[in-house]
C-alpha cells in the first residue's frame, strides 16, 4: 500500500493487514521539498525474501546521511503540520460542498464518499487530498485560470 499521503500518523497499514507499505518521504514526512527519498516496510516474511534476493543491492536501498537528516528534521514537525493540513482541508471541503458551482466533492470525511465507512474505521483523520467536479469543462477551466495556489509542477506538492 502506498501510504505517502496518509503517513503513519493517519493510517498504519501493517496493523490493518497490509503486507508491504511504501512511503514517499519527500512529501509530508520531509515537509520541506528539499529531499528525494522513500522507504518501504513489510512483514518479516517478506523482508526476509527481499534480503535473500538482495533486492537492496539492485535498487540502492540506502538513504544518504544528509537525506536522513533532512527527513528526521521534517519528522519533528510532522504532527503539527498534518494537524494544520487536515483542519484546513476540511475547511476547503466544507466550502466546496456548500458551493452552488461545485457538482460533487470527493473527500473521505464526507458521508456520501463511497469509502467513508472504511476511512472512519481505518484513519485517524482524512488527510489533505481533495478533488471536486465542476458543472462543465468551461467552469473547470475558469477555476484553474483564477486559482493562484495551484500550479502545474514536476513534483506533487512542491
Regions found by a protein language model. Name each.
Residues 101-158:
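Conserved C-terminal alpha-helix-loop-beta "cap" of PLP-dependent enzymes
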Amino acid at each position: 500500500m502506498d501510504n505517502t499521503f496518509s503517513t503513519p500518523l493517519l493510517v498504519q497499514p501493517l496493523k490493518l493487514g497490509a503486507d508491504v507499505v511504501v512511503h514517499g518521504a519527500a512529501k509530508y514526512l520531509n515537509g520541506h521539498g528539499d529531499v528525494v527519498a522513500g522507504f518501504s516496510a513489510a512483514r518479516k516474511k517478506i523482508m526476509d525474501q527481499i534480503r535473500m534476493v538482495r533486492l537492496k543491492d539492485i535498487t540502492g536501498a540506502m538513504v544518504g546521511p544528509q537525506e536522513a537528516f533532512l527527513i528526521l528534521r521534517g519528522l519533528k514537525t510532522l504532527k503539527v503540520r498534518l494537524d494544520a493540513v487536515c483542519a484546513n482541508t476540511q475547511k476547503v471541503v466544507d466550502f466546496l460542498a456548500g458551493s452552488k458551482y461545485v457538482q460533487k466533492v470527493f473527500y473521505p470525511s464526507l458521508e456520501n464518499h463511497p469509502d467513508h465507512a472504511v476511512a472512519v474505521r481505518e484513519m485517524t483523520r482524512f488527510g489533505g487530498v481533495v478533488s471536486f467536479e465542476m458543472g462543465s469543462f468551461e467552469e473547470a477551466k475558469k477555476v484553474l485560470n483564477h486559482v493562484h495556489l495551484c500550479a502545474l509542477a514536476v513534483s506533487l506538492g512542491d
